[in-house]
Regions:
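Phosphate-end processing signature that detects enzymes handling 5′-triphosphorylated RNA
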Residues: 1-130
Length: 130
């Protein structure tokens, strides 16, 4: 996470390992009365290092291993964190008019955390626990 420069805008950078190479991204999330929207763009390693100089020192990098998969056309992501041996966060991409996703076989859903501030990346960056 980067130090805020505008009210209602959260900025962050991300390094993602993809095979033997790294990809870098800059993201802004804007909050308005109508809701929130996020824009993300790829950046160079040099830009990533420059943005690191703007890091919010009250927060930590959120390290995780992300698993992506599809079942019956439904996309899922599971984030596994080194600071939690017993819990992970699963996300399902839902089409606009879709109902709740089917739980993949072999996965136990402990509870629904959509919208729960305790499971937002910004909180994980602050406290490093689930």
């Amino acid at each position: 996470y980067l130090v805020g420069t505008q009210p209602n805008v959260v900025r962050r950078i991300r390094q993602q390992k993809n095979g033997q190479e790294y990809l870098y991204f800059y993201t802004e999330k804007r909050y308005t009365d109508a809701g929130a929207w996020e824009t993300e763009k790829p950046i160079t390693q040099k830009e990533y290092v420059q943005y690191l100089m703007e890091a919010d020192t009250a927060l930590h990098a959120v390290h995780k291993t992300k698993y992506r998969f599809c079942i019956d056309g439904q996309r899922f992501e599971i984030d596994v964190y080194p600071f939690s041996e017993s819990r992970a966060i699963m996300r399902a991409e839902l089409p606009a008019a879709a109902s709740a996703p089917q739980t993949p076989q072999g996965i136990e859903i402990i509870r629904e955390v959509t919208g729960d501030p305790m499971y937002k990346n910004s909180r994980l960056a602050r406290e490093q626990k689930l």
